[in-house]
């Protein structure tokens, strides 16, 4: 997104890549890769992509956007060496995000929520509104999976008020996910930050089955305790790197 693009402009390794391929100051960019059997098929896919973009943007507008050059927002990169530059920047997305020079950093706790694809746009807008409600913004980065766009809200984990915001954002985000029949951990597993919410997301019946299965397979709670079942609060401060009242 625009946050990552702006940060990449300040990093010598990626500055030239942004300047060479990013037109203007877009709110976000999407890298689309085609790997068909022939080059002509790849070019045909690119043509289709341009037509799709024009169709999406032109909804409700009378002017011919294709003639106005709106399809030029699709930047075609053919040489493999140039494609590698884009790929390296994409793979470094998280590192670029974490280079943010502030106490507040992108924090992972709702980063891989997934919803059915037809609801992805509405979910994304809803999640953005939740971030705004709590005075922050989300940093969108990494690959776009099926029904999953990776995002981390920017919070200061040394601040008790931002820790409280983290819980509030999680509760509202997971409720939004549930409304769309999605998953609160689409890729990365439940872990400490999400296991607490499993009873809400899966329902008491299924969560009780999780507990019974855990007791059968791991009666002494030896393997990975506190995950999936019997989980601590996601904002329990004894789990944090920075305790309440932390000062430099």
Specify the residue positions occupied by each region the protein language model found:
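Noncatalytic alpha-helical scaffold of FAD-dependent oxidoreductases
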Residues: 1-143, 147-186, 190-248
